[in-house]
């Protein structure tokens, strides 16, 4: 059993400098400094979406996630990279100029991908880490391949550390992926009901009541055509959004007026989200079988 004071030795923990092979998903729209801080202090890699203040460096390694449809100028990426250990990109083809902007700030650069070809492109662009996202993931889904098929192919295709992402909600699942060669796992859905997360109460309650079969992949939430692509959400939110005509990609925050008619992102691991827990406790649970 991995205790918070122990280090699990993987290429990820050695490179990033954290104790546990876990990365918090940036959770755009609801991710907070407090959530990332709890994960960093607990031994993982805490992440915030671009625009949210990263946690203090003394708490542990942290990172900033950038979405390609809304990526800022290179100089802004470089400045952000100077404040964190990792910058990560998602929802776009790997771009060596963006990778260079992250490196210029002194950060490691990660790219979340949905296919082996995209993983190879990320490594060729100079990325230090590749996140292999299985189709089980919540939120925007880049590929169509289940994680158990994608991971062995990705590990064989690239030489940089590979993180597994998508549908990871149990300690046993995390341990199995690490044992099978993953350098770390990336988790998002399990943290959505944490008190440190900016999730609307109604959204959190819907997550707690949901099972694995209650998620669907849809292209409806495309931000009015600005961000096309598939996303995994709670099925009930899709029905309500279609009735209201809402197409916003923004997940329901505590300030949302009609939270359950918005993009209620959830991965297939939602079935393992059964109660509200502090982020540090979630991380300990996930690491308990390592």
Model-derived regions: residue spans:
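Active-site entrance/lid segments in N-terminal catalytic domains of soluble metabolic enzymes
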Residues: 1-161
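Conserved active-site-proximal phosphate/metal-binding subdomains
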Residues: 2, 137-140, 144-163, 169-290
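Conserved acidic functional residues
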Residues: 112, 166-167
């Amino acid at each position: 059993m991995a205790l918070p004071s122990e280090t699990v030795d993987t290429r990820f923990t050695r490179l990033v400098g954290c104790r546990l092979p876990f990365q918090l998903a940036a959770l755009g729209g609801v991710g907070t400094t407090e959530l990332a801080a709890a994960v960093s202090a607990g031994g993982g890699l805490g992440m915030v979406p671009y625009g949210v203040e990263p946690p203090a460096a003394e708490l542990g390694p942290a990172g900033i996630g950038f979405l390609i449809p809304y990526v800022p100028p290179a100089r802004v990426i470089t400045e952000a990279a100077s404040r964190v250990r990792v910058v990560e990109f998602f929802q776009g083809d790997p771009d060596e100029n963006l990778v260079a902007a992250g490196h210029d700030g002194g950060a490691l650069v990660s790219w979340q991908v949905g296919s082996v070809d995209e993983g190879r492109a990320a490594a060729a662009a100079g990325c230090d880490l590749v996140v292999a996202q299985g189709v089980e993931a919540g939120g925007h889904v880049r590929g169509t391949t289940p994680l158990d098929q994608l991971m062995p192919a990705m590990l064989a295709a690239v030489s940089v550390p590979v993180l597994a992402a998508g549908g990871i909600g149990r300690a046993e699942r995390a341990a199995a992926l690490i044992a099978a060669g993953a350098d770390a796992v990336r988790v998002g859905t399990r943290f959505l009901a944490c008190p440190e997360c900016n999730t609307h109460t109604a959204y959190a309650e819907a997550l707690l009541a949901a099972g694995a079969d209650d998620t669907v992949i849809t292209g409806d939430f495309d931000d009015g055509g600005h961000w096309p692509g598939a996303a995994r959400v709670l099925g009930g939110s899709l029905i309500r959004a279609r009735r209201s005509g809402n197409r916003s990609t923004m997940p329901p925050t505590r300030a949302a007026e009609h939270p359950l008619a918005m993009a209620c992102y959830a991965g297939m691991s939602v079935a393992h989200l059964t109660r509200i827990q502090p982020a540090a406790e979630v991380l300990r649970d996930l690491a308990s079988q390592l």
